[in-house]
Amino acid sequence: MSRFVKLLATVGTALCLVGGLHATGYFGPYIYLDDGGKNVQGSPEFYWGLEVRRISRDFHPPEKLVVSKEAAQKNEEEEPEERTKKTSDNTTETDLKDFDSAVQEARIKPADPAKAKEQHKQARAALDATASGTPTPLPTEFDSEFAAYHKGAAAYLKQQWAEARAAWENLLKQPEQDRRYRTVWAAFMLGKVSLKEKDFPTATQWFQRTRELAKAGFADSLGLAAESYGWEGRAEWKQDHPERAAPLFMNQLALGDASAVVSLKAVIPDREPASGLLNYGPEPEEREKWTDEQKRKEEQRETAKLKVAAQDPLLRRLVTVHILATAVSPDYYYTEGLKKAGVNRSARWFNIIQEANLSRIDDAEYLGWISYNEGDYKGAAHWLELSKGDSAAALWLKAKLQLRAGKFADATNTMSRAVEIMKTSAAYTSREGEEWATEDLSAKGEYWGFASSASGDLGGLRLARGDFVQALDVLFKGQLWEDAAFVAERVLTTNELKQYVDALPKTEPPKEGEDYNKKLRYLLGRRLVRDDRYADAKQYLSPPYDKVLEKYVKALKDGANEKLSKTERAHAWFTAAWLARYDGMELMGTEGAPDAYAESGEFEMPDLAKERRSGAYQTIAYDKEGNASYDENGNPKMKSVPAVLKASAKEIQRLNMNKITPDIRFHYRLIAGALAMKAAALLPDNSEEVADVVNQAGMWVKDRDEKVGNRYYQVIDHRCAKTKIGQADIAKHWFVDQEGPWSKAEQQAYQAFHKEIGLEPPPESESVPELESSPEPESSPEPSPR
């Protein structure tokens, strides 16, 4: 499904509640294997930019793209005026450098070089001022090819096309030895003048001539020979020659000019326009006003052009991948109109391809993906048979079909080959500076990148087959972090995970992005703490939580030390409880459910372990029109759907063995409460200390497990009725947010300890609560979300 369609869906979520909305209020998909692993059986997202980049690998133009420092550091969000200024600055800088070189090489010989350079600089400044909206006449210059070029440039900026053309044509009439530096520039600009005059055949000739002159040895300091491909492509497109424009845009892209990704959309006859985007035809608002007759004529025009495209190998490939990149998957119901539009477009293209009776179809596997996306698996197999079968896309499609046939082993082996090709193929690796390609490969979250989906599929297959360590390896190296974390925390044994982490190569932290090795080490450290393997855990925790662990372990030991007094032991248990409550996420929190450290505890994550144990997942119930229904509270009604990728008996056994205890969100709060109750057991009845400790334990657990909270309240009722805090609790019939002698001391000690080890105070919403010292039984919500 296209990213644009998903964007529409996201905008409309509040109205139609589509996509991965869970009963918890968590919006996804953020976990690839969620929703019963349906992604593993579904079609991956195809990206226009990535696919045309793959096709461009078949083109090998000899020219080199010249990229200025400013262009390399361009910000996609900056205003067009700022980008234009950067281009102008680069032209000015290059012009000045070329003039200096011409003087040094004695290609021009002014009597006063310094004066000539100053005149040249002033002329360039005049051109820049004119370009910025302040018309400025050219000053007198030393007579040379540079001055001749400037005359044409000044006329061009004033939109005096005839004068500009005459100036540059006169420049090209000079002897070759007198125009080494501005021959290519003049030819290129003559092409742009012809575009302005709508003389597209002449423009085409000049852009071709630009490349010929650069190849002949004339200076091309701005890389205009490379740039000419895109402009010539535009000239051919203006002449309605898509079969000529497409390879020119492809050469432009092959040279590294990503703007060709947008230009190539112009050669797609039936591309749907989108509001707010660059469209090559009538805008959406205009189309909405069309009569039925106008719509019929447009469809006829599109069909005729598609038939022409079907006969051209390159255009045929482009139309196919464009349909894939914009298709709406059948299991998404954003609007019925969008769904029908996707199906009709695909069906029309299939009919045209079949009518063309072609002897050979390049990239037939991509036609297979269109069929697969529509649920026509027989058709997908047909197109797959017509393909060479050795591309990543072909192998991936084959693996999907094998999975549907229940051939898990074959599907896993085939998918493994597909992923390996993606790792090594130039078509699926980014050139330096191609952030857009990197995103299409590895994007995660609201949509999945191509390579991310491949890793997710292979990881899911490995998991379903019981290849647990291999599943972790694929998901981890594919940077599907939440999925890898699930396997690491809930499927692997602790020793298996430790062995895997210890075998990771020592690498420098990445300059950008997340350090996944570090994240996995920290995940292991917290799991070891949950397993009470404190000595092992210390080296894996992120500093300074290794020091927090030391303090926590000492408190546990002191609490259990019967040689100490009851008061000393109680203090120790309460210190351990305080640390478990307020540093519990960092010490022992789970990366995924139930604690959601991956989301900083701010959102409840889908419980993949529960889902895979049950063999089903919950999703919103839609009717045939794609509408959701709601209960009396306004929540969408859910339905249970059988999992696509079912867990093996071996996996279920491990999921049961590796349960989080207690399996409750922020489970460490229950641990903190239990530790506090150990302290309470050592304190005398009806002391303010015991009331304080039990009340704190109740405050920590009351929103997590009401039954446990009720048990703690009974202790207040039986042991603390004569205390101020106990009386406040009894008056409220529940716990109160109130400070006592020990909680005040622990809070102060905790803050001092954090300062000592260099931990910044947490955000206000997550800080240790300022407990009320007043005995009044007023309630307040627990201030910490964790």
What is each model feature region?
Residues L21-N170, P175, R179-M189, T202-R786:
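Extracytoplasmic/secretory-pathway proteins
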Residues D199:
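Short glycine/serine/threonine/alanine-rich loop segments
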Residues A9-G19:
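Bacterial N-terminal signal peptides
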Residues M1-A9:
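Bacterial N-terminal signal peptides that target proteins for export
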